[in-house]
Amino acid sequence: MELKKTLNLIDIFCLASGSMISSGIFILPGIAHSKAGPALFISYFLAGILAMTGAISLAELATAMPKAGGDYFFVTRSLGPAIGTISGVLSWFSITVKSSFALIGMSIFLAKFISFDIVYIALFFCVFFTILNIIGVKEASIFQIVVVIALLSSMIAFVVFGIPHIKKENMLPIAPYGVLSIFSTAGFVFVSYGGLLKVTSVSEEVKNPSKTIPHGLLISLFIVAILYSLMVIVATGILPNHILDKSLTPFNDAATAFGGKLWDFILTISALLAFISTANAGIMSASRYPFALSRDKMIPDIFSKINQKYKTPVFSIIFTGIIMSIFLFLNIELLAKVASSTLILTYILANSTLIVIRESKMMNYKPKFRSPLYPYLQIFGIMGFLFLLFEMGYFVLMLSSLLIVFSLFVYIFYGRIKVNREYALLYLLERITTKNYTNHLLQEELREIIRERDEIEIDRFDKTVEKNKIFDLKGKYTYDQILNLISRETSQNLNIDKNLIKNFILQREKESSTTLSNFVAIPHLILEEPKRFEIFFFRIKDGTEFGDEKDVKMIVLIACSRDERNFHLKSLSAIAQIVSDKKFEKEWLSAKNEKELKEILLLTERKRIKPSI
């Protein structure tokens, strides 16, 4: 069963923003300031720049393959099911932990007003958001829009009203712990951008994903990164260093300093909105990873069951909610560090995935958005992420390694038995070694994804192309040689003597040339048998003489009865649109085999033929 496409640009913007803005900005700045000093705003901005590399890579991948599971789906199709399983588990764990941490943060702030144990408050909201996401993703996203707009408004107000109260002496010296501390602290605060890439996990539910996903992701990242930096500058400029270094509520303290209890209340509400939006977006995004893993047969089928009424993956959502509730009782600080390291690993995989899938040169990889500065942007991102990862320390790396081992265990003892999947790395190996490792299955899957993405209806021309053979000819041919070959190859299928076919083509060519250009010729035959339509495609990579042309690379022979004249004309129009595409000739000549030639004919953009009434 398909997921509903209900999310638009404002939904994606708010989902991305709501996933990012949380404890990373409302709690961490005080601790981070003790590591970097007043230059902390640079650390936040550097972390945002690195996050941009992953966001751009994921935006391209999401426009090529808008499927539930986001980065897990892309990694699996690029690096293989083993690495894909690792990616899915890491991503799910990272978002789930961050969401749990947001619930705890929310409980701490609510404790100002409610005299309940913070864990029980967090549990209540965990159940609430789980139910909200079961009811439907659109209902959850509407809630997200309201929360994020209110949150961003209060953050902007804090900056605008706080700037006049900045004291110069609090900003100096700007880097008391050295320049290197700025970079290491960027790793510490990187979790602040933790929800950004996870928006792609709901890409299958997005309207017009080719534009909506990249625009929503990049606009969200730009606005949030600027707001983070400005808010940190305001808090740093208002609070003395010795106070800010020890504060777990830095913006509340800064707001109280310039605006009293009213501003403290406003910032408390802002923090609560941030935690609410992160928890809600976290359950929505995290639950799509078990769903995607299950749909790929990596984990049991129950995780991919979709509720008939609400069209949401109920068991996957409930399972994620249960695990989040368990995390509420654990050491949140340690889990937050592990979440940060697993998040960085997923960013590394995102950039690596784009490089591999681009270099595989797969015919059906057709993103609507392409990363600028490829591959330099991705290489810069990978190197930067590796630096941040090793800055986090040995213990955190060991815990992340345990998660990787667990993911491999799941794949080896369940997923590997259930499924054998093609992936882009195999296509890249084919390019390097000239050996055959694939059966074109990934290309076919990508074709179906493109059809779903672009809402392409399979028309009669598609069906005709799919059922008929494409002839891939080697060497250069004279006019007589190519006519003999065409006549011989089509004679049996048409049940016509090969000499009659040859003579008919020659006679037709004398009356009027059938070459559409110096690249393609479209001869045709009239069949006496009623209701008959056949089409044969020939690629002559080294060229052939045909009529007056000396170097034709493509011949399309159409054989049809007189009562199929209408479809004959529509097919000619379809072929003309295909061969006039600016990329067609290059793709036609670079295709490796008959299957790739057929994919070009099926997926080159054209108007579809509507069935006759």
Regions found by a protein language model. Give the residues of each.
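Membrane-interface "cap" regions at the ends of multi-pass membrane proteins
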Residues: M1-G30, S34-A39, F45, A51-I56, ...
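Cytosolic covalent-transfer regions centered on His/Cys nucleophiles
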Residues: R416-I613
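Hydrophobic transmembrane alpha-helices that form the core helical bundles
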Residues: I31-S34, S43, M52-C126, T130-I134, ...
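A generic transmembrane alpha-helix motif of multi-pass inner-membrane proteins
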Residues: T342-L343, L373-E444
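C-terminal membrane-solvent junction of multi-pass transporters and transport-like membrane proteins
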Residues: F143, F303-T312, Y347-L397
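Loop-to-transmembrane helix boundary motifs in multi-pass membrane proteins
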Residues: K4, L9, P81, L123, ...
